[in-house]
């Protein structure tokens, strides 16, 4: 495991219980989206991973090493393998792009003759090789975040922490940053933890996700599995799953989930012909995830109890997820 958080509790001096019994694992190469509402404990959690915050109790293991047991110099060295980017970029305004990236290498005591080539390599990676002499005030928000990404990768980390890294960006720039991170992850075989309150970020970038609420992880798993079958009320709210049946009563109203391979199949029309049952489509949509697409239909079966039961058995036999909606 790249990251293991074990039985984490975080209680601040004012008595606020920010994290409660948190257990979390991250495997090599995974991109984990941690999502939740403001004040849920997301930023506290990510700052524990590199010990910018220390837990009240529990263990923080990165690559098998408990960071809480390290001496200050040992912790500083371990942090060099953990990159981090923030919502507001944290660039040095008095230094240009080249100098901002080089600064991370200077702190790590790289040899001067190696710093120049490494900075050029990093700026090429993030598409800013033509901006190396620009200062932060001359850059757009997206360009500033690219500089921050380059700086975070300076010491060849195997783990990248992103704390609301796209929250200050517009949707087009957010997409370009997520595309960049996805490409970098594949090229460098990084593991990424991405804190966000934006479900679109999870959809576009992540293969794993966890939902945090009031300091607790309430749901954790593959992105497509949670999108297909969310269990916790907070997860359903974040995914926008609420009152899909409108003002209609829920008698014989069902939510059907279509995973990847079934999206292009005429399943509903086949069901109507095969079982001589009428189907009223109340709502539907398709979620495009980074791993696979998922389709949803909310339908009402208009037929006898026997016909409805046969239709449900048919859908279950196809491996579709079918949930009867409640009032």
Curated annotation (Swiss-Prot):
It comes from the Bacteria. One of its GO terms (cellular component) is plasma membrane. It catalyses: L-methionine(out) + ATP + H2O = L-methionine(in) + ADP + phosphate + H(+); D-methionine(out) + ATP + H2O = D-methionine(in) + ADP + phosphate + H(+). It is an enzyme of class 7 (translocase). CDD domains: ABC_MetN_methionine_transporter. Residues 3-239 form the ABC transporter domain. This is Methionine import ATP-binding protein MetN.
